[in-house]
Amino acid sequence: LLPNVKGFVNPDDSLLAVLISHPHQDHFGLVQFLPPHIPVIIGEAAHNILRSATFFTPSGADFEKTIYLSDRKTINIGPFEITPYLVDHSAYDAYSILISANRKRLFYSGDFRAHGRKAKLFQKMIKNPPKDIDVLLMEGTTIGRGNPEDKFQTEEELIPEFVDYFDSTQG
């Protein structure tokens, strides 16, 4: 069931680190099988969320070696230069990632949106995107919302409803 990635199942020095864009299960689910000496690159808040979740659920995660991402601050791992871009997403502390090596540049969009609580981050990316990209690797969980006449509530519109509901509930 584990992916056939060098260094993931059998020890191999070619696996330098594992990069997690945000704390959703489909992005970190197999990290529990990672050899403990392999660093995990992740946002600090995302790591704290996953570490805290281990108290409540086996789907949380903690790592022995961690390298933290910070918006537009480049880190170097072996021949790779990694620049994270904080994005708006339902998972807190989510990033798009620019990876440069050997004069080539790959931009991974990660999961993102332009309509959430941090929608300004999308506009920031549009105004100042990474330049000279050779490869774009793009997530595509929602390309459309079906019928254009359908209206979906925003998070901002839902918050007062949740507050009213919680206020009216005992316990």
Regions found by a protein language model. Name each.
Residues 1-19, 25-171:
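His/Asp/Glu-rich metal-coordinating catalytic cores
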